[in-house]
Amino acid sequence: MGYKHIKHMKKCSALWACAAALAVLVAGCDKEKKPVEEAVTVPGDAVNLNAAGETANSYIVAPGKTSVFSAQFRGNSKTEAVGAAVSAELLWQDAASLIKDVYYVPETGQVVVSTGKASGNALVAVRDAGDNILWSWHLWVSDYDPAASLWSSPAATGGTVWKFMDRNLGASSADADDWNSKGLIYQWGRKDPFKGAVSFTVQNEDYSYSVTGEPVLYDIDNRAVKATAFENAEGFGAYEKSLQNPTVFYKILKDGDGVNIPKSKDWRDSSDDDAWGGVSLSKSVNDPCPPGYKVPVCAANGDHPYEWHDYSKATWDATNYGMVQDGQWWPACGTRVNYSGGLDFPQANPYSGMWVGTAGKASSDLEANPALYGRYTFVSNGKRLYNKYDQKDSRSQGLSVRCVAE
């Protein structure tokens, strides 16, 4: 039936007859007793996350509240339907009891979520009658109000100014001494997040890791789950498959023998240079940022959103491992490695990359430029050689994102 939250179930032969007669189950068969089954509705006190008329792939959700958002369309699209959803579920949460409840309301096509008092991140999804995931959303559980602390970048060469959030996407703090200021990890062009390292990693001589930095994630019952799986990104319709498998990190393209195929370092078999709006210059359906914000991209005149990033003007915080420039904190976060999906965050050389939604090389020119890249800026100790704001990395790499106002 697609309905959830059956409460106060009684043994009564007339139950289903009553249910059918009422269409939506609102009462039991014994009028003097409590209702046998509740209707699946949106609570009257629920915070509408689409109140401004925008939808997105992530939402900032207040702790200790009940919130509701539309699950009818993909991302910020008004036309690309999610499909025939019948249920919603929590895929993972990075803090126990972060999410208290989540359910789908078929009548309105909305997801209702209730949060605990903690801050953190969660991933929820809707499924169809065949139990297939149709779409998923990142819930950024925090009291954070981005508009209250936006930072305007220095004007680029062509005069473009970007208004940045004061923290990475998914960070529950902007404080340098808080590990939770690091936020989440994304493959270039994907909407779904992965958790970053919760400790520095230690690599062995054979390139295995004795300390992996992998986080503990939880299901709705606070049981530990392995929420990140890894698959080779072979040519099997990876984009649509990624939508059905939002917790799978698609590694660098390989053939059946495990040998790297040199023609592409993308995670998907059909590359899309506009996956994050780098061509259209508009927020894309795959953009991971909440309503009103998007992944920064290069401007039409070629201005780079991190052109202001200058090691000579920045200070490296050797205690908290990050860069401070113009009062903004840019933490080193490490990466998820493109060829394995494992975390890399060495204490001796801590670093991170901030994705830009502009392609490094056009996918249409694959033969001439066989490696497909996304552009990013490098965060590391200024004494290192990586001192330019415009870098390129394979699209299957997992890096950080800092959203800008649309």
Residue ranges and their predicted role:
Residues 1-2, 308:
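Short intrinsically disordered, low-complexity coil segments enriched in acidic
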Residues 2-5, 10-11, 19, 23-47:
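Bacterial Sec-dependent N-terminal signal peptides
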Residues 42-283, 360, 394-406:
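Short, compositionally biased
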Residues 171, 254, 259-406:
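C-terminal, surface-exposed recognition/capping segments
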